[in-house]
């Protein structure tokens, strides 16, 4: 009784220390006596097998009223003797053993009984002879993992290991029950304290047992809640006496890194067509994996008892070790004297040789690198000079060779680094970089564009969608009034025309207030002249909805006439354009309306914007707060995607779609992100041109 009283005093002091510290204690911080006490008072202390710590269960304790002890469940730190027995086991690897799983504990150790190993000779008879002189342990001496001798009523004796305390502890010490696993027979039972005796001379070192410590291949730790489920499966297998005696054929791959556990795998003990390791991983779950374990065999391979391939057999392993030892000895011997490669003299000689001739070995490679670098710099200078001389962005077309076009790297870098500002307040450097990059996309010769356009028109195998995209690009330049005002606009699509138009295009208003949704007039062979009701004849060129082959409401002109007209218009645009963003030409037939009366000017604007045959539209811009830089970037990328779709260049198309999606993820502003999402949807719709 005095021993139990002393344990309670120590337990109360430990609980007070943990409560004051407000943290659990590592098991290594505690001495052997404190570890012994914490393992017995599971009602006060909680053990975490994954962190190897003891924590105080928050509750009210009174020193005057002792709390009865109760042993916790066995853990991996309590089976040191069984691990030594496993390390000394004479087992060939890999090989099959007929085992019976007995119990599973955290973090992950399965106690498995080897049915093929016999009981040590003469041990049972010796224990029966020594039974009358055996001493019983007290309740204060019982801890999980301790090995005792269980004495049956027929005087037969069996060695067993304590798993945990079973049943109610509100009984006398002699009637307390403990769940034990036998070391020499596959059995797990609950026994009373009065039937247990000290081990004496029948230790595992003297008489090795057949109970081994194992773990499933590829699994280092199981989930904390899965321990009870796994033990439930083992109990289902264990209750069948036929299965318990016959066991299951398990493949023993090898011992683990520490050498005290067997890495095994076997068909599912529940009868499913899965291995035990695969069932834990895929069906129930695990906590962590063992990366250094060998590759597990499949269920069929385990059933057919196949052995895994081994790279180095046992016969050659010693040779490899001898070679490694000789190499190490040679390296250690070479460190003496001036022959050491790290000697100061050798280091100085090496540095001096590198100073004298640093590039002789790779001079050719360096020359090629410098040449490529110089050519790239020259190309950039020429491009800058050409842009300065002629700031007009030219329409771009793919060459006839069909080269892969990708979006300029600088645009991708700017998008990835988030240098485009959504609120429109960017620095001048950002504005200049975006302007130059957008010009580089469209800096090709007009004559080549017109020729490629003519070839695309004459090619009979060109698809309808590709023709539509080509027509929009080649006919996207027309005369505009000199005084214009650019305001944003919403996305407008002609439902009867399948040609994809920019989702956010600027609305351009002239001095009279006239506007149209596309940002610039698209010339067409079908022009009409209409006079206003005021009597002052103002001739306006209107577009007759002939931009696409699919939704055209009027007859299309011939390809030859359209091509010739486009060539003449492009040449005229190249010679007289001065606007960097919009290509404008003064129209002779557009009269000035400044001297008109206000009533006639308002009536003219009304008829132009709401007339039945007029193709213009005025709308409130939903994305007015989106910066011009982002709009320009989106328009440039979509124009480039039209070219890739027209040239059937799917690789460049996919790459630039991916670039737009990546830019969208970098945008913090929700309005700008929604704007760019619509642009991405519009860009993806251009993929129909590949069909």
From Swiss-Prot:
Q: Gene encoding it? A: simr-1
Read off the domain note.
Answer: Tudor domain specifically binds peptides with symmetrically dimethylated arginines (sDMA) and may facilitate protein-protein interactions. The Tudor domain contains the conserved arginine and aspartic acid residues, which play a structural role, but lacks two of the four conserved aromatic residues, so it is unclear whether it is functional to recognize a methylated substrate.
GO cellular component entries: perinuclear region of cytoplasm
Q: What is this protein called?
A: Protein simr-1
Q: Tell me the organism.
A: Caenorhabditis elegans
What does this gene product do?
Answer: Acts downstream of piRNA production to promote mediator complex-dependent endogenous siRNA biogenesis from piRNA-target mRNAs in the RNA interference pathway in germ cells. Not required to identify target mRNA by the piRNA pathway. Plays a role in both spermatogenesis and oogenesis and in maintaining fertility over multiple generations, probably by directing mutator-dependent silencing to piRNA-targeted genes.
Major place of residence: cytoplasm
Q: Where is it located?
A: Cytoplasm, Perinuclear region
Keywords for this protein? Cytoplasm, RNA-mediated gene silencing
Q: Name one GO biological process term.
A: spermatogenesis
Q: Where is the Tudor domain?
A: 139-204
Spell out the residue ranges making up region: Disordered: 547-573, 588-618
Compositionally biased tracts (Polar residues) = 549-573, 588-598
| Effect on the protein upon substituting residue 159 to C | Progressive fertility defects at 25 degrees Celsius, with animals becoming sterile after 10 to 11 generations. Expressed in the cytoplasm of germ cells, but does not form germline foci. Inhibits piRNA-mediated gene silencing
């Amino acid at each position: 009784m005095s021993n139990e009283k002393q344990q309670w005093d120590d337990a109360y002091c430990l609980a007070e220390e943990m409560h004051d510290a407000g943290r659990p204690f590592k098991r290594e911080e505690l001495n052997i006596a404190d570890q012994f006490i914490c393992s017995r008072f599971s009602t006060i202390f909680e053990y975490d097998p994954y962190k190897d710590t003891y924590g105080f269960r928050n509750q009210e304790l009174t020193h005057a009223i002792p709390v009865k002890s109760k042993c916790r469940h066995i853990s991996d730190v309590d089976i040191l003797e069984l691990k030594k027995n496993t390390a000394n086991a004479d087992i060939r690897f890999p090989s099959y053993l007929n085992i019976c799983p007995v119990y599973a504990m955290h973090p992950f150790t399965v106690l498995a009984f080897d049915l093929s190993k016999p009981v040590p000779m003469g041990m049972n008879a010796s224990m029966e002879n020594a039974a009358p002189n055996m001493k019983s342990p007290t309740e204060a001496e019982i801890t999980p993992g301790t090995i005792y001798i269980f004495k049956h009523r027929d005087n037969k004796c069996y060695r067993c290991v304590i798993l945990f305390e079973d049943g109610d502890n509100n009984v006398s010490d002699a009637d307390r029950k403990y769940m034990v696993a036998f070391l020499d027979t596959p059995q797990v039972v609950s026994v009373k304290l009065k039937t247990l005796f000290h081990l004496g001379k029948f230790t595992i070192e003297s008489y090795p047992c057949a109970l081994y410590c194992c773990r499933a291949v590829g699994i280092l730790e199981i989930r904390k809640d899965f321990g009870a489920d796994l033990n439930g499966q083992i109990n289902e297998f264990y209750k069948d006496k036929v299965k318990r005696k016959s066991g299951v054929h398990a493949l023993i791959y090898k011992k683990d890194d520490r050498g005290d556990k067997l890495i095994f795998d076997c068909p599912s003990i529940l009868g499913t067509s899965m291995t035990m390791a695969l069932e834990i991983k895929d069906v129930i779950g695990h906590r962590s994996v063992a990366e250094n374990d060998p590759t597990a065999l499949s269920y069929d391979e385990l059933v057919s008892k196949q052995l895994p391939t081994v790279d180095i057999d046992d016969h050659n392993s010693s040779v490899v070790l001898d070679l490694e030892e000789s190499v190490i000895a040679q390296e250690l011997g070479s460190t003496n004297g001036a022959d050491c490669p790290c000697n100061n003299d050798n280091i100085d000689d090496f540095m001096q040789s590198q100073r004298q001739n640093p590039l002789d070995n790779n001079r050719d490679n360096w020359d090629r690198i410098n040449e490529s670098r110089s050519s790239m710099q020259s190309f950039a200078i020429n491009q800058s000079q050409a842009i300065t001389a002629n700031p007009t962005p030219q329409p771009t077309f793919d060459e006839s060779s069909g080269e892969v076009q990708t979006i300029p790297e600088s645009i991708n870098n700017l998008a990835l680094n988030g240098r485009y500002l959504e609120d429109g307040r960017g620095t001048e450097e950002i504005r200049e970089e975006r302007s130059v990059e957008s010009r580089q996309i469209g800096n090709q010769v007009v004559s080549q564009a017109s020729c490629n356009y003519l070839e695309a028109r004459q090619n009979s195998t060109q698809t309808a969608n590709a023709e539509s995209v080509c027509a929009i690009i080649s006919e996207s330049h027309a005369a505009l009034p000199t005084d214009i005002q650019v305001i944003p606009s919403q996305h407008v699509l002609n439902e009867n025309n399948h040609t994809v138009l920019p989702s956010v295009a600027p609305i351009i208003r002239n001095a009279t207030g006239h506007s149209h949704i596309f940002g610039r007039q698209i010339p067409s062979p079908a022009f009409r002249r209409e006079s206003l009701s005021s009597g002052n004849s103002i001739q306006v060129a209107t577009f007759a909805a002939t931009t696409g082959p699919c939704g055209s409401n009027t007859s299309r002109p011939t390809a030859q006439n359209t091509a010739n007209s486009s060539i003449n218009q492009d040449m005229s645009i190249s010679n007289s354009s001065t606007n960097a963003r919009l290509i404008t030409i003064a129209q002779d037939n557009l009269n000035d309306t400044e001297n008109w009366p206000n009533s006639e000017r308002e009536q003219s604007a009304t008829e132009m914007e709401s007339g039945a045959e007029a193709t213009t539209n005025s709308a409130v811009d939903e994305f007015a707060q989106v910066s011009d830089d982002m709009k320009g970037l989106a328009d440039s990328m979509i124009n480039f995607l039209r070219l890739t779709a027209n040239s059937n260049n799917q690789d460049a198309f996919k790459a630039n779609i991916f670039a737009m999606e990546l830019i969208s993820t970098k945008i913090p502003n929700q309005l700008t992100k929604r704007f760019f999402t619509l642009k991405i949807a519009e860009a993806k719709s251009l993929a129909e041109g590949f069909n």
